[in-house]
Amino acid sequence: MTYAGFWRRFGAYFVDFLALTPLIAITIYGTNLTRWFQALWLIPGALIGIWFSVHLVVRYGGTPGKLAMGTRIVMDDGSPITRKAAFVRYSVLFGLSMLTSAALAYSALQIPEDHYMSLGFVQKSMLMTAAAPPWYKGVNLAMNVWVWSEFITILFNKRKKALHDYLAGTVVIRKAA
C-alpha cells in the first residue's frame, strides 16, 4: 500500500470543503432568515454529516475530496472500510460539531426575534457566540485542537495516519493507477 501524504490529504479536505459550500450558503441564508434556523438545522445537518462522512466512505471508499485526490480509505490490513470504522473515524468531530451547534441554537433562541432580525450575519454570529452557554468555548476549543491535531499527526508517522485513523484502525492510501 502507498500511503496518501499530507498534501494529498489536505487537498482532499479542501475539495470536501468546496463540495459542502452550498450547505454553508444555506446556513448563512437560514441564519439571516430566522433565529430558529440553528435549532431546525440540527438534525438535517447531522444527517448530512453522517451521509457525507460515513455512508459515502463505506460505499465509495472516501469522501468526494478523497476520491478526487486519488485516494481511498481502507482498514489497516487493506480490506474495505467497515461501517463501524467509518463511524468511529467521524465520531469525535461529529460529537464536537453537534455540541457546538446545539450551543449556538440555544443562544440564538435566547435573543429576542426583533433584535436578532435587526442584525447582519456577522453581528448575529458574534452575538450567538457571546450568548452561548459557558461550556461552548471549551468545546469549540476542543474542536479546533482536534482538527489541527489531525493534520499535525499525519506529518509525524510513516503510515500518514491521522488521529481518527488510529481510533478506527484505518489508513488512507493512494488508489492504484
Predicted segments, located by residue:
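Membrane-interfacial and juxtamembrane segments of integral membrane proteins
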Residues: M1-A177
